[in-house]
Each structure stands twice: as structure tokens, then as C-alpha cells.
Amino acid sequence: MADKIMLLDGHSLLNRAFYGLPDLTNAEGKHTNAVLGFLNIMLRYVEEEKPTHLLVAFDRKEPTFRHIKYKEYKGTRKPMPAELHEQVPLMKEVLKTMEIPIITQAGIEADDILGTIGKEAEEAGFDVAIVSGDRDLLQLATKKVKIKIPKTKASGTVTEDYYEEDVRELYGVSPTEFIDMKGLMGDTSDNIPGVPGIGEKTAAKIIKEYHSIENAHEHIEEIKPARAKNNLQEYYEQAIMSKDLATIKKDCEIAYDFKDAKIGTLFTKDAYQLFKELELKSLFKYFGEEEKEEETLEVVSTFDLGEIENVFASIKEEGQAALGIIGVSGNCKGLSL
């Protein structure tokens, strides 16, 4: 049976977890909902996928080659909320205690790290599962590379799994052709312009028939509707640039070793201490400790020592008595008579 590597898109999953769960803080006021949601997703998939290797890729603050090509790239994004921003280094600290490698690299995005390592892992004989909330990664799907897209809600996490054939079934195009679709329709979240007036349905129809933006342009007189034809002709260079921006690199030079991603003991002593500090009680079960509820003991009746003779007199008259042990969580807390 082939080894399997699971690659996680760090910022994407944190962001999805942050907006999918209500705000949580520990006693010190640290926000923890994104960290908890991230761990819930990761640990669920570790149980389901049973990977032998695991790593997480994060974006960096520096501009990437995409920003150099197009200054407005991601220019419309709102700043990260402070409550989420403070959880990024916290999440990295948690992963470090679990001995899960983190990869970041200046000049490229986490997507490019995932694309490069995913391709190299597939070529090395691994089965690959890439976890991200970003549908752009569908372009990386193959027969052996599965894209897992979680949707986090208060009621739980729902997952969409995509291999190459699943992308074809959904859009009618191959994962590679999906990039051309993005080039035509653009991407508002990344501020990739695309071609005005061409949305997802029209883009899918054009690429399904012509397979690439370049080939569609060569058959420009055949493109329908007329508005799409005219706009593609006018904004062709913008479409090519948008395709380039949407293309995830799979040939980056990244310093890493698959041996470092081999899963060992995720639930280390350091991880347990940090989980306790963050009060992630629902995850204590992974350390063999159930979440403990507040222990309370209600006193139903009492008597003073002056009445003790009357109690024993009643026992003598009845000829028998029952002695009960009051226990909480396996511990004796008192007696009842």
C-alpha cells in the first residue's frame, strides 16, 4: 500500500475555521476559535485519510511574483481581523508542539508550495490529499491527487472531495482547463480581472468547446454570445494575464525532505500542555483524557451529633440499614444512610 501525504493550506483553513465557529477565548483572553476549528478539520482528516506524512504550508507577508506582475493582485482584500491575526502564530506554535512541519517561502504563495510538493509527492509514488478552502486548487487534481474542500459550520464540517474526474463532472473541463476558465471569469477574491461580462457558465462553455483561451481567440468569430466574443477580442491580453495569475506553480525550488513530514506522535506532552493552556477541552480525548465537567455535590439532609443516638436507635428498631457511597467521577465524596 502506497504512502499517503496530506498537505494543508494553513491560512485558508484558519480563515474558514474562524468564520465557521463562534468566538472562543481562554481565561487569559486569547482567541482560540480558528485554532480549534483548524485542529478539528485536521484531526478528522487524519482519522479518515490515515496519511503517513503531513505538513502545512502558510503564506508570508512579502509580495509574491504575482504582485510584481499585477500590482492590484489581491488589492481589494480587507485586512485580517485582529482576532484572527493573533491566532496565526498561535496555530504555528500548536503545530510545532505536534511535530508537524510548517513550510513558508518568500516570493511564492502557499498554493505554489502545495502544488510543487504535491506534484513531487505524486511522482515519488505517494497518494496525495490537499486540504484547502480555496477552489483554485482544483487545478491540482489528478487521478492520485485528491483536493479536499471543507465547509465549516457551527453544526460541523462538510467536505467536498475532487479527483480529476470529479472536476470534469462538475465543470465539464479538465483541471488544467479549469485555469483557462479562471482566466476568462476572473476571481474577485484575488482581484484577478478576467474578461468583463464572462461569468462561470460562459467561461465553462467556451473552454469546454475550445479547451484554452488561446484556441478560443483563434476561433473568435465562432464565440457566442456576441458580447463574450467582443469582450474576449478586446480584453484578450488581460485574459492571458489573468490565466497566468491563476496558474499555481508546480516547479518551485523548496528546501524540504519527505522524511520530515513522517507522522510520529502528534499528541506530545508539549501539545497537551498547550491544549490545556488554550482550554481546548474537546480535544483532551486525544490524550486519553475526557473533558471533565464541573463537579458539584448537593447535600440533601444533615443532622448534628446530638441526634446521632436517635439515628442508631432507629436502626436498632428497624433491624437493618442501608449505607450508600456518594461518588463523582469514580471518587468517593461522602456517605448516605
Show the residue positions of the predicted features.
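Short, active-site-adjacent cap segments at secondary-structure transitions
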Residues: L13-N15, E62-R66, A110, D136-Q139, ...
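Long, highly charged low-complexity segments
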Residues: D257-L337
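A residue-level signal for conserved active-site and pocket-lining positions in enzyme catalytic cores
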Residues: D9, V56, L114, D134, ...
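Extended two-metal-dependent nuclease catalytic cores across DNA- and RNA-processing enzymes
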Residues: A2, T25-N26, G75-D251
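Domain-level signal for Mg2+-assisted phosphodiester chemistry and nucleotide/NA-binding surfaces
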Residues: M1-P101
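Structured, non-catalytic alpha/beta "coupling" segments that mediate domain-domain communication
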Residues: V46-A57, D127-K143, I149-P150, E234-K250, ...
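Short acidic, glycine/serine/threonine-rich loops at helix termini
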Residues: A17-G20, R66-K71, L140-V145, K151, ...
